[in-house]
From Swiss-Prot:
It holds the Pfam family LpxD. Homotrimer. The gene is lpxD. It catalyses: a UDP-3-O-[(3R)-3-hydroxyacyl]-alpha-D-glucosamine + a (3R)-hydroxyacyl-[ACP] = a UDP-2-N,3-O-bis[(3R)-3-hydroxyacyl]-alpha-D-glucosamine + holo-[ACP] + H(+). The active site is at 225 (proton acceptor). This is UDP-3-O-acylglucosamine N-acyltransferase. Keywords: Acyltransferase, Lipid A biosynthesis, Lipid biosynthesis, Lipid metabolism, Repeat, Transferase. Belongs to the transferase hexapeptide repeat family. LpxD subfamily.
């Protein structure tokens, strides 16, 4: 089922240039792979060379690229082309694969005290334990578990296999064995949060683990007990956040990175993939803590040198002092 360019512009705004509102769009496609019935996007000026060769019926571009876009055909001018593209994908999904109707699937298991908003959707084999709450317009896909007293805000999307409110990892040592610390807190998830498949968010020990409004979590993420993640932060796949860490608002954490427990990240901190965050970061900025990849022989030599870095530094300082004294 196609959409007309006019329908897209009417729904999303922007300015259609050099094309007809009646042009049918059959799919949304990457710039270099797009065909005559496709809508595409030029998300960054560095891809401008692909623009002239693209066969797309229409391309979403920034106003600064209007002339280059019109030289090849129709375009939609948008101040933020990538955000416009994102909304176009949402519009496409609404027309071609609408969200499930509100309600609770017959195979879901809900404690009698669980509360589900009438506009929420609970998918197959979901479990909502005692006192769990799901807010307006939220969607839980298959096999999501929401533990006792945990709360999901409005318009959230939890993908298959998410577990909210499992016990945090808390044990006290005594005489060579471990004594379990019961996790008496819960999890509070704000509005407009998306949580990827098989991600786990542990309940707090005494206070709640908190995921604030607009946070986006990828697949296979582990969020430890008592963690707090600030508004509109985004964490990529396989990130691990240890207990009691606090991540500010508008932060990003790349795939496979680890944040150690009890650390604090300021607002607007950006962590590169595979970085291990070992100290609190109080200033906004991009941080990387990764030994660069190399062929194995060179890597081993560099690693061996790194182990001796302190002694080499002391030798250089001694040489500098000797030269000054000479």
């Amino acid at each position: 089922m196609s959409l007309l360019l006019g329908q897209i512009v009417d729904a999303l705004g922007g300015s259609l240039q050099g094309g007809s509102r009646d042009t049918p769009i059959c799919r949304i496609a990457p710039l270099q792979a797009a065909g005559p019935g496709d809508l595409s996007v030029l998300s960054h000026p560095r891809y401008q060379q692909q623009l002239a060769a693209s066969r797309a019926a229409c391309v979403i571009v920034a106003p600064a690229l209007r002339a280059a876009a019109l030289a090849r055909g129709a375009c939609i001018l948008a101040e933020q082309p990538y955000a416009y593209f994102a909304r176009a994908t949402q519009l496409w999904r609404q027309h071609h694969a609408p969200a499930p109707a509100p309600g609770v699937h017959a195979s879901a298991v809900l404690d009698p005290t669980a509360q589900v908003h009438p506009t929420a959707s609970i998918g197959p084999l979901c479990i909502l334990e005692r006192g769990a709450q799901v807010g307006a317009g939220s969607r839980l896909q298959a096999r999501v578990t929401v533990g006792a007293d945990c709360r999901i805000g409005a318009r959230c999307l939890l993908h298959a296999g998410v577990v909210v409110g499992a016990d945090g990892f808390g044990f006290a040592p005594e005489d060579g064995q471990w004594i379990k610390i019961e996790q008496l807190g819960a999890v509070r998830i704000g509005d407009d949060v998306e949580i990827g498949a098989n991600t786990c968010i542990d309940r707090g020990t005494l206070q709640d683990t908190v995921i604030e409004d607009g946070v986006k979590l990828d697949n296979l993420i582990q969020i430890g007990h008592n963690v707090r993640i600030g508004k509109h932060s985004a964490l990529a796949g396989c990130v691990g956040v240890a207990g009691s860490a606090r991540i500010g608002a508008h932060c990003t954490i790349g795939g496979g990175a680890i944040v150690l427990g009890h650390l604090e990240l300021a607002d607007h901190v950006h962590i590169s993939a595979a970085t291990v965050v070992t100290r609190s970061l109080t200033r906004p900025g991009q941080y990387t803590g990764l030994f660069p990849i190399d062929d194995n022989a060179r890597w081993e030599k560099n690693a061996a040198t790194l182990k001796q870095l302190h002694s080499l530094r002391e030798r250089i300082k001694a040489l500098e002092q000797a030269l000054k004294a000479a």
